[in-house]
Amino acid sequence: MDYVIRPLTPADEAIVWEMLYLALQGSESSTPPPPEIVRRPEYARYAEHWGREGDRGFVACDKGDNGILGAVWFRPPPEGTTPVLAFAVRPGHRKLGIGAALLTQWVRANPQQDEISLKVQPTNPAVRLYERFGFKIAQQSDDAVTMRREI
């Protein structure tokens, strides 16, 4: 599959919302949550008014039809809290290297980011991908793993 990775722009807010919903769906075998879950304040803060100062991210697009394959993005958090990286790859396009390419692009573009975290379901195979990029398990419960990367 040929794809291109480009920066997310303010015009891509709809893509960020779509990818946020995919990120919240969890594993492909779980029942997806209702689409309106993204409007809950604890999740909407990752997408609402995308393109503000400090918002950074990348999207992978199919070279053939320009379809969205995945995205990785970051929004500066309130002072004193660890920043959270949001990340999603569309089902059917996972395990093809797209996630690794997105994370590589994000890490290269943000060398000054000395601390970042992400949350993932413990059964998600992407845990191994995150570990390859230096993320380590910081907290674990039955339904979520918080991973942190420090440089």
PLM feature segments, named:
Residues 81-82, 109-122:
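Conserved GNAT acetyl-CoA-binding A-motif
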Residues 55-57, 141-146:
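Short hydrophobic/aromatic beta-strand or adjacent loop that forms the aromatic wall/cage
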Residues 94, 117-128, 143-150:
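Conserved beta-strand-loop-alpha-helix junction that forms the acyl-donor binding cleft
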Residues 131-141:
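Conserved acetyl-CoA-binding loop of GNAT-fold acetyltransferases
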Residues 10, 21-92:
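Acetyl-CoA-dependent GNAT
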Residues 89, 95-108, 131-132:
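Conserved acetyl-CoA-binding loop-helix of GNAT-fold acetyltransferases
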Residues 1-14:
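Conserved N-terminal entry element of GNAT/NAT acetyltransferase domains
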